[in-house]
Amino acid sequence: MKVTLDEVAARAGVSLATVSRVLGRRGAVAESTRAKVLEAMSELGYSRSTLLHDAPRRLVAVSAPGNPEHWQVQVCTRVAKALQDHDLLVTRPLVETDPEPLQTAIEAGAVALVTTTMTSLNTEIPCIRVAEQSATEEVSEAGTEVIAARLDLGGGMTTAFEHLRAIGHRRIGLICNDSGELAVQLIRRFLAEHPARNLGLNLEDWISRVPKSFSGGSRAVLELKDATCTAVIVQSALQLHGALHGLRNRHLQVPRDMSVVGFGDSPTMKFTGPPATVLGLDVEGLSNALIDATLQTLRISTTGLPSVPPVFRPRLVARTSTTAARQ
C-alpha cells in the first residue's frame, strides 16, 4: 500500500507543510524536527524517485570571474581536478559578474569557494583566493577570506618596464579594464614603477581604461598612439588581440610602430601576428597554492596554512611584438 505524506506527517507529529520543507530542503526546519520526519519516513517505508539521500562528500565551488583570462581558467581546471581526486564534489559557478550562481551553489551546500579573482567577495563560506602582494586586505565580517597566494604585480611591471627601457622605450602606456580589482592594482603599480614617474609628466594620459573587449583594445591602442606612446602593456587577451587589429587597420606595424606586451600567457599568444611578448604567470604554482590552502581550510590536510602566503612574480616571455624604439 502506498504511503502518503499525510501519514508521514501524522507519524512524525508535524504539519504536512513541515514534511514538504524537509523533503524539498526549503525554509528553516529545526534539526530535531527534521530527524523526526526522516525517522517517520524510514519506519513507514516512504520513498520516491526524486528523494535523494544526503551526499557523504562535501561540495566546493571553484570559480573564475565572468569572461576569464586563460590563466584563470587553467588554474581553476587544475584545482577542480585535484579536489575531485580528494573525493570532493566540485561546482563551477562564475563570480563577480552575477552573484546568483554562487548563491545557488551555497544554498546547495557548498562549504568553500576557491577563486582566481583578486576581488574580495565577502562570502558567507570560506573564500580561498589570490591577492596582489602589497594590497591591504579588508577582512570580511565573517572572517572567511583565506589568501592562498599573492601576485607580485609591482615586480611584474618592473620586469616589463626594464625590458622596454632596455630597447629604448620611455613613453609606455597601459591598456586595462574599466573595472575590477586587478585593473586597480595594475594602474597603481604602473604609476609607482613607471620609468618616467619623476619627470613631471601626467602618466594618467598614458592609461586607457576600456571594457574588456576586442573593440576596447582597438580603440585604446590608437588613443595611446596618438598620445605619442611607443609601447603599451595590455591587461587582457581580448584587448591585446583588439590592439593588434587596430594598429593593422591604421596601416601601422607591430613592433615597428608600437611595441606590445600582454599580461598572462596562452597558446594563442604564439600566433597573434607577431607572436606576443607577455608577462607569464606560474599556473602550476598558483594552482598548488590554492589546492593546499583549500585542503587545509577543510581540514583534509593537517600541515597548516603558511604564515606568509607564497608570492609569484610574473616572468617575461619575450617574443617578437617588442623591438627597439624608433628614433
Feature locations, PLM:
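N-terminal helix-turn-helix DNA-binding module of bacterial transcription factors
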Residues: 1-56, 326
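Alpha-helical recognition/docking segments in bacterial nutrient-uptake
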Residues: 57-162
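Periplasmic-binding protein-like
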Residues: 61, 106-117, 171-176, 207, ...
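Hydrophobic alpha-helical segments within soluble ligand-binding/sensing domains
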Residues: 134-137, 142-174, 184, 214-222, ...
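An alpha-beta-alpha
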Residues: 158-199, 304-322
